[in-house]
């Protein structure tokens, strides 16, 4: 056991991705008036909560991770950390993260983090991931919480913008996850995990990807139409979203489903990154947007 194991078991890649969306939500609510001390507290607090959830997930999935090529070398599978130590580590990370959000931000942001944590660890990892094809849908709510946490940490209000962020990022999670399930089809099949491509076929997953990307594109526009983001954000959201939709539609003609799914997955990351950046740098008040339309 080494320091590397303590880092690896938290899934740093997932933490980094969540930090980007937390920042997007935070800067969207800040509207150019950034409290960097608060920002640091929110980023660290959310990262600790996400890390805690990932460690608990490693503990829960240790019996199936050895069956999957992409997870067979995880710390718990290789015996790099004992189960009791991992559980203690996960608990300490969670307590530290929730406490930081509650004390340095506000109870609302800590509550949002708690909801995301319960959904991911309790409903998804412990139950639905292995039992239902709808596990991905339920799990998407946890993946959508980080930008909401960032937004609520500043606004201290669960308003229309927070709802829009929750819907946007939940919808984004679905095609992103289905694409992974397609190019990792053999892994999920070997572990008997009923993701959509395994349970109902790749064609069914392709149809769902197109529908969810379309819904995502429409949802992204609501930040500007609702008066929370500017026209620069709108232009980027529309361009990225429509191209992602074009890629998704191309799945019906794809000769290599795995190759196509990897492209859809890769562009999904570019899309959510671009939107997180733009909603942070091009946030506006409703009055600003209305004045723009009036000119």
UniProtKB/Swiss-Prot annotation:
This is Protoheme IX farnesyltransferase. It comes from Pseudomonas putida (Arthrobacter siderocapsulatus). Residues 1-9, 57-78, 127-197, 248-268 are cytoplasmic. The keyword Lipoprotein does not apply. The gene is cyoE. The chain crosses the membrane at residues 10-28, 38-56, 79-97, 108-126, 198-216, 229-247, 269-287. It is found in: Cell inner membrane. The lineage of its organism: Bacteria, Pseudomonadati, Pseudomonadota, Gammaproteobacteria, Pseudomonadales. One of its GO terms (biological process) is heme O biosynthetic process. It comes from the Bacteria.
């Amino acid at each position: 056991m080494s320091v590397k194991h303590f880092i690896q078991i938290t899934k740093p890649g997932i933490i980094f991705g969540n930090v980007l969306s937390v920042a997007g939500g935070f800067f969207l609510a800040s509207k150019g008036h950034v409290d960097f001390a608060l920002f640091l507290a929110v980023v660290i607090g959310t990262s600790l909560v996400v890390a805690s959830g990932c460690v608990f997930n490693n503990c829960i999935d240790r019996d199936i991770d050895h069956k999957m090529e992409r997870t067979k070398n995880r710390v718990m599978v290789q015996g790099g950390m004992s189960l009791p130590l991992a559980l203690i580590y996960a608990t300490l990370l969670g307590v530290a993260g929730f406490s930081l959000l509650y004390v340095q931000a506000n109870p609302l942001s800590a509550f949002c983090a708690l909801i995301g944590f319960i959904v991911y660890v309790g409903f998804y990892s412990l139950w639905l991931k292995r039992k239902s094809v709808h596990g991905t849908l339920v799990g998407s709510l946890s993946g959508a919480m980080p930008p909401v946490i960032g937004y609520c940490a500043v606004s201290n209000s669960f308003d229309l913008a927070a709802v829009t962020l929750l819907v946007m990022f939940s919808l984004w999670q679905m095609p992103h996850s289905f694409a992974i399930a397609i190019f990792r089809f053999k892994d999920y099949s070997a572990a008997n995990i009923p993701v959509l491509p395994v349970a109902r076929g790749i064609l069914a997953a392709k149809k769902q990807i197109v529908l969810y990307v379309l819904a995502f594109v429409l949802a992204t526009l609501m930040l500007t139409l609702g008066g929370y983001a500017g026209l620069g954000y709108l232009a980027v959201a529309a361009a990225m979203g429509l191209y992602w939709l074009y890629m998704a539609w191309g799945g019906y003609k794809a000769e290599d489903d795995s190759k196509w799914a990897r492209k859809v997955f890769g562009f999904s990351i570019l899309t959510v990154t671009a939107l997180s950046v733009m909603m942070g740098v091009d946030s506006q008040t409703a009055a600003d947007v209305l004045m723009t339309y009036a000119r």
